[in-house]
Design a protein with these regions (language model features):
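N-terminal secretory/targeting leader peptides
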Residues: 1-54, 63, 71-264
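Conserved glycine-rich "GG(E/T)P / GGGxP" loop and the immediately following alpha-helix
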Residues: 68
Length: 264
């Protein structure tokens, strides 16, 4: 049985249920797993992937297997990773194309890496529940937020932040997780079949999301969204110290970073 649209709770809650044997499988953002295994921060580091094609190559390789195995101590196993595409800035009052223009309060996901990233880029990172973002931008508590085009349109946040600025700063993965006891209860043949299906689903999901991004950009344009191309190298340069910091935190993050670079 599949329960979409947060019927069983938000992502933090569903992963908790998965670790407590109350839920067999769940799909959650990398930042949620990062709260259990901090080394996962390397997968959500700004500008760590050169392109969506590069990210897909990394996810389809076996080079993340050692990192994925570290979640077992917390009661779940990561089977595969996907991506909705690059996250970009969107703002309420004006376009942002350079770091100098980003002296704004921007909603980010609630991880230390994401907050540090936004601060490094020139803004002020504010962690906030997604359900509060629309009204916070509307009232001026926030100047904007950041997300992929699909989520931006689905949440109709273009109504309060019509400037969509292509910074491409993050490609946060979503990971498919299974309860460790459930996985271990399966026969070896069934385990291999499940892992094979999970691996094959990566290409399907990347292709599907590419089609969705194209459709959603068209929808956004119809709604009057103003697209701007940002000075990506300038933002990337400001994030380099953060990239180096995350990459060199542990032997695992260093190995994963080198594996990501090797797929470029």
């Amino acid at each position: 049985e599949v329960y979409p649209d947060a019927q069983l709770g938000d992502q933090q809650q569903t992963l908790e249920q998965c670790t407590m044997d109350a839920l067999d499988m769940t799909l959650v953002a990398n930042s949620i797993i990062e709260t259990y295994v901090p080394d996962f921060a390397i997968l959500g580091t700004p500008y760590v992937y050169d392109s969506i094609e590069h990210q897909q190559k990394v996810f389809e390789s076996s080079k993340l297997d050692d990192l994925f195995a570290t979640t077992r101590d917390h009661g779940f196993v990561v089977l595969s990773a996907y991506s909705l595409g690059a996250r970009n800035l969107y703002t309420r009052d004006k376009a942002v194309t350079t770091p100098e223009e980003l002296a704004m309060k921007i909603r980010v996901m609630g991880s230390d890496t994401c907050i540090a990233m936004m601060n490094a880029m020139g803004g002020v990172g504010v962690a906030m529940a997604q359900g509060d973002v629309y009204s916070a931008i509307q009232t001026g508590t926030l100047d904007g937020a950041e997300n992929n085009i699909i989520t931006y349109v689905d949440l109709v946040q273009y109504e309060v932040a019509p400037y969509y600025n292509r910074t491409g700063h993050l490609m946060i993965p979503d990971e498919l997780c299974i309860n460790a006891k459930v996985f271990d209860s399966m026969s070896a043949e069934d385990q291999e079949a499940l892992k094979k299906c999970a691996s094959e689903s990566i290409d399907y999901m990347f292709n599907l999301c590419a089609e969705l991004r194209s459709d959603y950009e068209a929808k956004a344009a119809e709604k009057g969204v103003i697209f701007s191309d940002a000075d990506v190298p300038a933002f990337q340069a400001l994030c380099q110290d953060l990239i180096n910091d995350v990459a060199n935190r542990t032997d695992m993050t260093k190995a994963v970073y080198e594996a990501i670079v090797s797929e470029r």
